Amino acid sequence: MVLNINSFYKNCRGEFMRAVFIYHKNNQRMEKFYKNLLNEPDFCRICDDCYNCRGNWTFKNNVKNIVIEEVYEEFVDNPYDYLPELPEGDICIAQLHEDLLYELPLLLKEKGYKALIVPSETPHDLSLALRRDLKRVCSNYNIEFENPKPFCSLEKKEGNEYINKFIDYFKIGKPELEIEVENGLIKDVKVKISAPCGETYYIAKRLKGKAIDDLKEEIANAHHNYPCLASMEMDKELGDTILHKAGYIAFEVVEKALKK
């Protein structure tokens, strides 16, 4: 499969960032990450009293998704039977069969990508061994690499020039909020950075008008109702479920905003 979309992009690094999502068919988590950045009118329909709390922005001219067929084999002899030709870009966000992931950095290097992000939403999305290999291979190609577990744990790091720009540009990663309190009640909440799935906008809406003492229950309910799509399976590395880790992050960012 060849995607002839390079002319769609401006080659204006620093002023125009290009992100490409690549994942297998039926990957609902990656589909949600991608569609969050499109911000189409029907993306979020969770509230009956919708007043478009997300706003009228879109990154439809900055993002593309490449959906490839599912791989059922445990080992893939020729990953290039599945991997398509990639468009040029800056950042690649990928969830793929591990044999395909291992070959991906070379393709990214050839197309001028500066970073690879492989989010883990289940304990099986990326093995620790392949994480080490990808980090090494990407380093050899001068490609930044991160494996956030979950995606909403992605935050800026020293040395990650392009991933830091990705967070600033698309306003996704570890959430950041600005909260205004009046007489013990939440008067207003502004989303500075959203979780990649878009949940932060829903949490912000749910918090408005609530008493500070009631926030813990409100955040927990919002996290499960949105819903968070992270796995409920125990992750050995975390010693907890990734769903719970995402929930802890949601609590943490609200507490941090209240202290400012």
From Swiss-Prot:
Pathway the protein acts in: Pyrimidine metabolism; dTTP biosynthesis
Listed GO MF terms: thymidylate synthase activity
Pfam family membership, one: DUF166
Keyword Signal among record annotations: no
BP GO terms, sorted: dTMP biosynthetic process; dTTP biosynthetic process; methylation
UniProt xrefs under InterPro entries: DUF166 (IPR003745)
Record-listed E.C. numbers: 2.1.1.-
UniProt keyword terms in alphabetical order: Methyltransferase, Nucleotide biosynthesis, Transferase
Superkingdom field: Archaea
The keyword Transferase appears for this protein: yes
Function summary: Is able to catalyze the biosynthesis of dTMP using dUMP, tetrahydrofolate and formaldehyde in vitro, i.e. a reaction equivalent to that catalyzed by bacterial thymidylate synthases (EC 2.1.1.45). However, M.jannaschii like most methanogenic Archaea lacks folates, thus the physiological cosubstrate is unknown but is likely one of the non-methylated methanopterin biosynthetic intermediates.
Protein name: Thymidylate synthase
Organism the protein comes from: Methanocaldococcus jannaschii (strain ATCC 43067 / DSM 2661 / JAL-1 / JCM 10045 / NBRC 100440)
Classification of source organism: Archaea, Methanobacteriati, Methanobacteriota, Methanomada group, Methanococci
